[in-house]
Amino acid sequence: MGEDRGQGLTRPLFDRLAFQSTVVTPALFLAPMAGVTHSAFRRLLGDFGGHGAVFTEMVSASAFLKENADLSPFTKRRPIEGPVVIQFRMSDEDRVEAVIEKAAALAPLAIDLNLGCPAPKIQQQASGAALWRDFARLASVLRRIRSVYAGPLSVKVRLGDPTEDWRTPFLERLKLFEDAGVDVLTVHPRFSDEKLKRRARWELFPWIADQTRLPVLGNGDVTRPEDVSGHTEAFAPLAGLMLGRAAAVRPWLFRAFAGLPPVAIDHAEVWDRLWGYTLEDFPPERALRRMQEFTVYFAQNFTFGHQLYKAVQVARDVHDLRRIALAFLEAGPQLRRN
């Protein structure tokens, strides 16, 4: 048994943000994370609360048209999750209009376009960072989205390519977003080729916010409220905050940012609860992989967490995985100070 040891706040760091006529309170968002922010994890996050809205995993536009959106773990929803933003990766070769019309029928909080994913496989399909790079195709995709959808539209970006003049194409795209009717901009301040070990450039948030009339959400490397309160000059111009990897490590993390009281945490119970949720939403073989991915993050709560995540990677099936994980978690492993 442990506890939520975040210092917490007396009020949310970011009180509210309007997505057109819908106000999200607080303006704290779960980031889209491949393999993690599926329906089962979003349900677990909802159990703890503190967030304002959640993003789905990055959904393939072409695959989405073949899925039953009410059953797919990418897009199925439960009330406890709160407002949900559906994030897509797409190119101008996709059936953009059909994808957006199908997504709009689900009545999400917003539809989001991923323009930052640097994975080679994604870029080879002319989406993610590759779509950001191709101005004409990006403009075409945004125009086609808006031709069939008037609801809240957001985009998630990085800084672009690491050239000396990176600010010029960045500003050109900010202007494009405004002209195309984008409502909210999320910025992860790393360049397209940078891995996550490179520190996010929080110091760029004020400049970015000053260059656009769009509300800006900040994303990248924030793990505790003190990161924000200790860098007010960087975060004060933002309209909201997006948390990713840190929330996968500690699904209760949003409570501290929202000013909610800390709660006692039984790490074994939390892991086991997600195991059950995941089996409800995925077939066993896919649930195994999803829980292995989650455990890589969750193991970071412990001083010797590497023993946990290495052990679960060789599990034969979901039941073997559960046996291995609970043997570690129920033994009272030493907590690491996050």
Segments (PLM) and residue ranges:
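Short glycine-enriched, charge-decorated loop/helix-capping segments at active-site entrances
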Residues: 73, 126-132, 195, 258-260
